[in-house]
Amino acid sequence: MIEADRLIQPQDLGQEDVIDRAMRPKLLDEYTGQDDTRAQLKVFIEAAKKRGEALDHMLIYGPPGLGKTTLANIVANEMGVNIKSTSGPVLEKAGDLAALLTNLEEGDVLFIDEIHRLSPVVEEILYPAMEDYQLDIMIGEGPAARSIKLDLPPFTLVGATTRAGSLTSPLRARFGIPLRLEFYNVRDLSSIVARSAKVMDVPMDEGGAEEIARRSRGTPRIANRLLRRVRDFAEVKHDGAISRAVAQSALDLLDVDSEGFDYMDRKLLLAIIDKFMGGPVGLDNLAAAIGEERETIEDVLEPFLIQQGFVQRTPRGRIATARAYSHFDLIKPD
């Protein structure tokens, strides 16, 4: 499996969630990027508040590290309600979910991260809860067992997933508001880096923010992580201020190149170019060649490489594009 301490991996590393919490926007007006999603949410939230109703159930999906948890908390703040957070793997038994549902107050947000990993038993409990605000529970065992219905207050379920295609059709159909998060552009990510630096009281100019953003793979979580490491470098090697030159030196030292690639990205690209003559190469062969799992390539390595035009996914397999060759100062054969 991929190394857990990979600097540019989009998943949370240990205590990062606690550290990042202080840097997260609390309201939609503070939220940068994802313009279409933000505009839609603003309308949906305002409409629900005008009607005095709970917001419709919402599914937020997209690559990791783009702010799904942040958006769920913003929704709760904008609606003026509480949020209870959990994740799919934690909800092992129907009783685990029932305990959460019965403690919700009217309008509250229940946030389930990695919702695609819910067990079928737990998912069955969700259906009537989402549709009718009712909880079906079994009392007793064997022939004497009976089902009773408990009424639940209207609530908003916010599900987050990196694998929307893995959700069952019945569950996916019950979300009235599907929102896809995209990778951030450099301009929006620069604004996020600048905001985080201000929260951290780190002096930084526009060039420094842009350089960190440019190497952050379009992902706020990675940008904030790189900002913390560049801050360390600036404090020890310089006067504490982050300029473009300081950011470049620090990130070069950390082996994060100008495109935001580390050794794993370069390993994947070079495997396609050198071992498979540029492709096409099947996913299983590529996974074996670089010593990684299929899921790691599909969920972690590939999305950004494809989105940035370095890898093309075809029915016959993965192909390295001319841009991938150019990154290594190579010329793609005709």
UniProtKB/Swiss-Prot annotation:
It comes from the Bacteria. Pfam families: AAA_lid_4 (PF17864), RuvB_C (PF05491), RuvB_N (PF05496). Residues 258-334 are annotated as: Head domain (RuvB-H). Mg(2+) binds at T69. Homohexamer. Forms an RuvA(8)-RuvB(12)-Holliday junction (HJ) complex. HJ DNA is sandwiched between 2 RuvA tetramers; dsDNA enters through RuvA and exits via RuvB. An RuvB hexamer assembles on each DNA strand where it exits the tetramer. Each RuvB hexamer is contacted by two RuvA subunits (via domain III) on 2 adjacent RuvB subunits; this complex drives branch migration. In the full resolvosome a probable DNA-RuvA(4)-RuvB(12)-RuvC(2) complex forms which resolves the HJ. It comes from Shewanella amazonensis (strain ATCC BAA-1098 / SB2B). It catalyses: ATP + H2O = ADP + phosphate + H(+). This is Holliday junction branch migration complex subunit RuvB. The RuvA-RuvB-RuvC complex processes Holliday junction (HJ) DNA during genetic recombination and DNA repair, while the RuvA-RuvB complex plays an important role in the rescue of blocked DNA replication forks via replication fork reversal (RFR). RuvA specifically binds to HJ cruciform DNA, conferring on it an open structure. The RuvB hexamer acts as an ATP-dependent pump, pulling dsDNA into and through the RuvAB complex. RuvB forms 2 homohexamers on either side of HJ DNA bound by 1 or 2 RuvA tetramers; 4 subunits per hexamer contact DNA at a time. Its EC number is 3.6.4.-. Residues 4-184 are annotated as: Large ATPase domain (RuvB-L). The keyword 4Fe-4S does not apply. Belongs to the RuvB family. ATP binds at R24, G65, K68, T69, T70, E131, D132, Y133, R174, Y184, R221. DNA binds at R294, R313, R318. It is found in: Cytoplasm. InterPro entries: AAA+_ATPase, AAA_lid_4, DNA_helicase_Holl-junc_RuvB, P-loop_NTPase, RuvB-like_N, RuvB_C, WH-like_DNA-bd_sf, WH_DNA-bd_sf. NCBIfam families: PRK00080.1, ruvB. Residues 185-255 are annotated as: Small ATPAse domain (RuvB-S).
